[in-house]
């Protein structure tokens, strides 16, 4: 399966693009914008069908969107003057993976643990507990191992949580306050270098993403060649 990586750079004159990619945006709205780049009429789970993973990147020139998919997004489906898209295939990078190769990696993920029912009741914990600091780093090391990577260096930085509200399809606007489900995905950005231990596991992790919250900008694993350590 061919994978594509697209960088979406919002047009400076598009207030809509700046709003949708900016801080405090509705992550559900951003998800809908991303999915609008792909054909309609597919079965449920359209994100999985098109292999979509995405992440907002803060750059000196403003916020950009990185988008991975199994078919190129269609820029004609965006509003006029919304953004510029640049797409390239990831196959050459993925095909060249081999054990021992050193890579740069980046992933904004949602590190959590799910305590058992007894532990939750005893300590009055929620069903999902966000991880921070050393606990988040340890979570990443486990995820990297399962993804065919041996972590060499790691920098972790908390980023704003992905927050939104979800409503049943038949809920009226007047009843939304009573029937909404709160969505909250704690997020940490992990950067560093790693050595490839299992290319097949790594390809699967790139294809499938890491962790939860993938519809809300979590889980995209980006890799790039790095010089081998001396």
Each language-model region and where it sits:
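RNA-interacting cores
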Residues: 1-230
């Amino acid at each position: 399966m061919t994978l594509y990586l697209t960088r979406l750079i919002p047009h400076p004159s598009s207030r809509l693009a700046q709003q949708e990619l900016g801080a405090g945006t509705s992550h559900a709205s951003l998800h809908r914008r991303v999915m609008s780049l792909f054909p309609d009429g597919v079965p449920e789970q359209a994100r999985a069908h098109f292999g979509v993973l995405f992440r907002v990147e803060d750059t000196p020139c403003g916020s950009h969107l990185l988008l991975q998919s199994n078919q190129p997004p269609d820029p004609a489906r965006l509003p006029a003057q919304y953004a510029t898209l640049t797409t390239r295939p990831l196959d050459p990078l993925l095909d060249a993976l081999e054990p021992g190769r050193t890579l740069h990696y980046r992933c904004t993920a949602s590190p959590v643990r799910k305590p058992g029912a007894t532990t939750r009741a005893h300590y009055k914990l929620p069903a999902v507990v966000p991880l921070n600091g050393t606990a988040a780093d340890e979570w990443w090391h486990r995820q990297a191992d399962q993804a065919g990577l041996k972590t060499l260096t790691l920098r972790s930085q908390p980023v704003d949580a992905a927050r939104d509200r979800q409503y049943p399809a038949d809920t009226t606007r007047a009843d939304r306050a009573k029937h909404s489900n709160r969505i909250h995905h704690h997020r940490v950005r992990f950067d560093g270098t790693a050595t490839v231990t299992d290319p097949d596991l790594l390809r699967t992790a790139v294809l499938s993403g890491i962790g939860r919250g993938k519809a809300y900008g979590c889980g995209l694993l980006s890799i790039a060649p790095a010089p081998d350590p001396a």
